[in-house]
Every structure is written in structure tokens, then in C-alpha cells.
């Protein structure tokens, strides 16, 4: 069973949408498990303080290393990878999602305010992970993105395992266009090759479409694809 731990100030956010549909069914069937930790509970003062002002001045507040470290130490699993969700981190991609799906468990720390005391990251061997070049108000939304990208790769979660292999990024390319009934809609017809029944021609068409779309929309991916 694949396991995830979420360290957050808002435990009621979870499991949220991950308790619905295929992921909810997989959770019930114990394909994966989720533990949610409110790290505010590690604070011992009357006000349960988890943040403070940064040394050297500056705007905003920082999460305190001592509070988060205590929460992590009380809950971490042996050998698991711990990620702090941050725009400074390594960017999540399909390759990393697949890598994480092969772990036994991961922990995700949902940040708030202006960030976290840097000493926490170095002393607890925490990796920083980003979902993109933009800023969110908190790490919870990013945690959902990470979990969504990983859970669908776990064996037994998707109804059609083959569908994982046909999607964007699986072969280094963006996904080809797809069509369903009706065959003609608003005077636009489905491409004839998809109606031919010739699987080799369909495969070639889909590859050429994926290549063309990737070349125009994601030249960075296209360059990597050409090198491989």
C-alpha cells in the first residue's frame, strides 16, 4: 500500500477531492493511504504559535523550524522522502511523478506565510518541490496536484491501465487529438484515418499529431524528444 503524509495547518482540507471517484475507491480498497498531520499541535505555547518574523528584517512571517521539526520527528517513516512545497523547488513532471509512485511513502509539507526557516530543510534532509512558476497562498493546493499526479500511476487505481501510456508526457510528447461520437458535428468530421480500422495507420497518425503539437506548443519538450 502506497502511503502519503500531509503536514498542514488546515487538516480539514484533506482528503477533499481525493476521497471521490477512482482515488476514493482506491483509498477504500487500501491501494493507498493518507495521514494528515496538523503541525500546529506541535507548538507548546498558549497561542500555538507556528511562525515568527525573519532575522534581518523583511516582510511577512516564517514557519518556525523547531515546531515543524518536532512534528516531523514524531510522525516520519524510516527512509521516506520528505518534500516542502515551494516555488523554489525542483519542478514536478511526469518522470518525477512516476518515481514517487514507486516509493513506499512520501511526506508533503504545506507551507504558508513567506516560507520556512532554512535550517529545517537542511537538518531534516527535506527536498523542495514546485508545481510551477507561480505563487499560491498555501501548499495545500500544490499537495493535491502532487498526489493526483502520483495516485493515477499506482497499479489498480485506473480502470484502464493502458490509458496511462497514451497520455501527454508518457513518451516525451504531448497527447494527440481525440474524437468521439457523433462522427460529424457542426459540419466537422472525424479524421478519416481514425475510421479506417488500420491500426498501423492510426498509430502513425497519432504519433505525427503528437510531434506536430509538441513542436509548436512545447519547443523545450520537442528538443528533448529529438535528442532521445
Swiss-Prot record:
Keywords recorded for this protein, A-Z: Cytoplasm, Methyltransferase, S-adenosyl-L-methionine, Transferase, tRNA processing
Biological-process GO terms, alphabetical: tRNA N1-guanine methylation
Record-listed S-adenosyl-L-methionine binding positions: 111, 131-136
Principal subcellular localization: cytoplasm
Annotated GO CC locations: cytosol
CDD domains: TrmD-like (cd18080)
Enzyme class: transferase
Catalyzed reactions: guanosine(37) in tRNA + S-adenosyl-L-methionine = N(1)-methylguanosine(37) in tRNA + S-adenosyl-L-homocysteine + H(+)
Annotated compartments: Cytoplasm
Keyword field contains Transferase: yes
The enzyme's E.C. designation: 2.1.1.228
Annotated S-S bridges: none
Single GO MF annotation: tRNA (guanine(37)-N1)-methyltransferase activity
HAMAP family from the UniProt entry: TrmD
Family of the protein in this entry: Belongs to the RNA methyltransferase TrmD family.
SUBUNIT field: Homodimer.
Function, as annotated: Specifically methylates guanosine-37 in various tRNAs.
Protein name: tRNA (guanine-N(1)-)-methyltransferase
Source organism per UniProt: Pelagibacter ubique (strain HTCC1062)
Gene that encodes the chain: trmD
